[in-house]
Amino acid sequence: MHRHLLSLTAAATLSLVLVSAALAAPVRSADLSGRSICWDNGSVSSYGAGGTYSNSMSGHGTWSMTAGGVHIHTDRYDYVASVQKLPDGTFHAVVPVAGINATGKYCK
């Protein structure tokens, strides 16, 4: 019985993850412009309405939307982040070349 409950719990959790991922949408400029996101890796990204960008780890620079995602250019880095907005309002960012896989939400 215990084994069935564990299997059922695992299946339910996996289905929620898959449904959440399926409902995620690429981030839009309006989601970021003028906002700051606090990431689970301890960094804070600020996306200025005029395209300015700052991050506590990667420095200051610019951001813009591209077909591939969010282009970030700072004094230290230049990369495109694949950013999704999840149904619960959190964000998920992946930057394979930098080894970044972070979840965040609007800073309060």
Where are these regions (language model features)?
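Positively charged n-region of N-terminal signal peptides that target proteins for export
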Residues: 1-5
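Lipid interaction determinants
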Residues: 6, 20-108
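Bacterial N-terminal signal peptides
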Residues: 9-19
